[in-house]
Amino acid sequence: MQYSEIMIRYGELSTKKKNRMRFINKLKNNMEHVLSIYPDVSVKTDRDRGHVYLNGTDYHEVAESLKEIFGIQAFSPSFKVEKNVDTLVKAVQEIMTSVYKDGMTFKITAKRSDHSFELDSRALNHTLGDAVFSVLPNIKAQMKQPDINLKVEIRDEAAYISYENIRGAGGLPVGTSGKGMLMLSGGIDSPVAGYLALKRGVDIEAVHFASPPYTSPGALKKAHALTRKLTKFGGNIQFIEVPFTEIQEEIKEKAPEAYLMTLTRRFMMRITDRIRENRNGLVIINGESLGQVASQTLESMQAINAVTATPIIRPVVTMDKLEIIDIAQKIDTFDISIQPFEDCCTIFAPDRPKTNPKIKNTEQYEKRMDVEGLVERAVAGIMVTTIQPQADSDDVDDLIDDLL
């Protein structure tokens, strides 16, 4: 027998009573975006559960995609069969004989939404249970925590049988918590920060600073590849490339070396905040981890934050590097992140950056520059690209080819 659909059980949105349908509609939209790589698959949702119709598509590939989508608590692949007792008996016997192993226990859980069906739920439980005993006489029934819980649902159009319950990603559907601007470098931390923001329902737009010719086309391609990895959790992501060469050259020329990183980050924060304002974002998200590098001390964060009143979310701020790497490997961004392309934060990195910069000093150095003009020109020059989910490709090999 071949699976015909996958039944979706919702996650935390079950607690969002007043906004429930808004959350469900957003989840449906996200599933459609992520599953768009399977042209024959369709999605339907109602108040209690969702349904992914396979229409001949390989179940295992679709299931792997569903495991990543936030807002799904669990899902079950289902067999669609004709709605009569004889057909149900044969289907249940075939399924049970294929999955049963010595010593396993079972339970039949029948449910009717079509009350015109000839047997009620209790009678159907008994009939199908007897059918299992007739082909597996040594099997034992167990009502609490059986090894196999065979669920039979009688709907208006057909009957559906399932026995697997696969854990989903949980969290909230992406987009239900508003929009945030992710400051995406090419490193390990910022994609992980983006992933964790997505899990809490934030619709992220990736802001990436490029400084050609100091940063290469390969660095930009790397940032695109990292963004594409994040699309599998909720669908399309807007990638915003910011021209940053003029600003970095200006900072290099007019500020002391120890303050290069602080001033660079302050400009990045200003620009990201301006983009957020123009694109109706609510927060800024970055991959800062406390004490990991010179620009991530509390004093540095304070000096950098001083340029905006917008909330800054730092999902990995308390994590050790190994904890961040574990998540990066889980979400398949690590091997891309470690490819050796320089980004804006490394090309002019000073040997001894200031770890406790003073706000008054940074402001004094910025008076040597046309801060507003530099920010305006950078924002005016942004390029926005829609990054879409796609079938698995070897992004790492592509990046290595660029290096060679």
From Swiss-Prot:
Pathway where it operates: Cofactor biosynthesis; thiamine diphosphate biosynthesis
Gene3D superfamilies: 3.30.2130.30, HUPs
Cellular localization per UniProt: Cytoplasm
Source organism superkingdom: Bacteria
Class of the enzyme per the UniProt entry, highest EC level: transferase
HAMAP family cross-referenced by the UniProt entry: ThiI (MF_00021)
Similarity-based family: Belongs to the ThiI family.
UniProt-recorded name of the protein: Probable tRNA sulfurtransferase
